A protein has these predicted regions:
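Bacterial N-terminal signal peptides that target proteins for export
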Residues: 5-15, 19-30
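C-terminal motif of bacterial Sec signal peptides marking the signal peptidase cleavage site
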Residues: 38-41
């Protein structure tokens, strides 16, 4: 474990080019896989991460731990820290910022010293840097201030050594954690009042908003350009930040700098991974060690025996569970940014035409796709599913109100297609992705097995609905079915 003490951090002044993650370097160097980033000078944003209701449903010993074996709350703190003391778990595919380096030359001069650093493999020095964290050697754990820094040569002047010395070969981190900490400050300033400090979608203004702000802790984001089995990509999150979500209270941050948006994206991903970690860990414990489960077990067992069994499980099995969850998070979030995850139509967009729209409406009404079941025959968002009572998939108990619910248990009205407002974007490719992958976390399913040409026909029809002289005017009742369309070149401007 090594610590990065980030002093007087402002919203973006230390980002520079510090976007090279040193996770891989940490693993090659054999350094413990946890990096603690301690922020001071941010008292205006002091806060703490909340734990989920599902964590609270566990018995106290499962939450806090037994003896030396940590429970859910302590493991969350060990791996993720709190907003003032973020911890960078090396398994997480997050761009923390900063660069790893080794000391090549160290020449002390009183309380100061001239140092030359050599960047680690695959690392790029940040253009601006104000501190160095000593990772190995006699000064390990110290944070030293830079009075001058040259990113081109790696030469620096350290000030206020206080007796600390470095030697050739010592490992240091230059401005480590600058990106994630900048993201944290920006998030607290611009996002937390709706999305909450922990990303739980329960900030102080959330109760007044419809739809509710996104709860990141599921690791699920609705509007993506990735396939139905993949998570949200960085580019998807950047697009939401830049352009907002039409028809909701999510605004556009188009005037923010690219490096600021990038920092927020990394912090949102960090919060999502923290929430997923908590959920997956609780899933391992809930069946035997929730308050409800223990109450049932007490009919035949003693509480002391149950707690003893829990202590053994936490000490012997949970470390492996934690590593497994970390590996799963790493794999799934890395995959989301891969070419394989991105939705790419196999044919160009079918030119928008009356025939294409008719074919699209045929498909919309077909038993195979059955779009009208939710969106209504005329696309007004009033299909029969809006008055049916669903069961909660977790509790298997019907919801109190009719209609469609998402994974956050929010009531979702299917989109009224006559408004022309599409929350995931109104570009043809945006609608293609909504149909291909569905809307993650909602009842809108994936139609990935539908021929891409047919998806384009549906896109053309849906985009025409707001301009129909009357609902269903492009319907097929008075018109012959449109013939199958050959793969066509993109329409002008597409």
């Amino acid at each position: 474990v090594y610590r990065l003490f980030v002093q007087s951090l402002t919203s973006s002044s230390r980002l520079g080019l510090a976007m090279k993650s040193h996770v891989a370097w940490l693993k090659r160097a054999g350094i413990a896989g946890l990096l603690s980033i301690v922020v001071s000078g941010c008292s205006d944003n002091n806060s703490s991460f909340s734990i989920s209701d599902r964590t609270r449903s566990l018995i106290p010993e499962a939450q806090t731990g037994v003896s030396e074996a940590p429970g859910v709350v302590k493991l969350l703190d060990e791996k993720f820290g709190d907003p003032q003391t973020l911890k960078a778990w090396s398994k997480l595919p997050v761009q923390w910022g900063g660069a790893s380096a080794k000391v090549e030359v160290f020449a002390a001069d009183g309380a100061d010293a001239k140092v030359k650093f050599v960047a680690g493999e695959g690392q790029t020095f940040p253009e601006k840097a104000t501190f160095v964290n000593v990772v190995t050697g006699a000064g390990a754990g110290r944070t030293l201030q830079l009075s001058s820094w040259d990113a081109a040569t790696g030469e620096a002047v350290l000030t206020g050594l206080g007796g600390a010395t470095l030697a050739a070969g010592d490992t240091c981190s230059i401005d480590g954690g600058a990106v994630i900490q900048s993201g944290r400050v920006l998030y607290m300033r611009h996002c937390s009042h709706c999305h909450g400090t922990a990303g739980d979608g329960n900030g102080p203004t959330a109760q007044y908003l419809y739809p509710r702000p996104r709860d990141y802790r599921h690791g699920v984001f609705k509007f993506t350009s990735t396939n139905d089995m993949s998570k949200v990509s960085r580019e998807d999150l950047l697009r939401v930040l830049r352009y907002g979500i039409p028809g909701t209270y999510m605004p556009s941050f188009l005037l923010m700098k690219d490096e600021e948006l990038t920092a927020i994206v990394e912090y949102v991903r960090f919060l999502s991974m923290r929430g997923e970690f908590e959920r997956k860990l609780v899933n391992e414990l809930a069946s035997d060690y929730s308050e409800e489960a223990v109450e049932s077990r007490l009919k035949d067992e003693q509480r002391a025996d149950i707690v003893g069994e829990l202590a053994k499980f936490l000490a012997e099995d949970v470390p492996g569970v934690v590593d497994g969850i970390g590996a799963e998070l790493e794999e799934s979030w890395v995959a989301a940014d891969s070419d394989e995850a991105k939705i790419v139509p196999s044919v160009p967009r079918v030119p928008d035409s009356e025939e294409s729209r008719r074919r699209g409406r045929e498909l919309y009404l077909s038993k195979t796709l059955n779009c009208a079941d939710c969106h209504g025959i005329d696309g007004a968002g009033n299909g029969p599913q809006t008055v049916a009572f669903e069961k909660n998939p977790i509790t298997n108990v019907p919801y109190d109100e009719p209609g469609l619910h998402d994974v956050w248990d929010n009531l979702n009205q299917p989109r009224n297609l006559h408004t022309g407002i599409f929350r995931g974007g109104r570009r043809p490719i945006d609608l293609f992705c909504r149909i291909h992958a569905g809307i993650k976390g909602s009842r809108m399913p994936s139609f990935k097995n539908t021929p891409h040409e047919d998806i384009w026909h549906i896109v053309n029809y849906v985009l025409s609905i707001p301009f129909e002289p009357e609902p269903g005017a492009t319907g097929v009742a008075s018109a012959p079915a449109a013939p199958a369309t050959e793969a066509a070149a993109p329409a002008a401007g597409e």
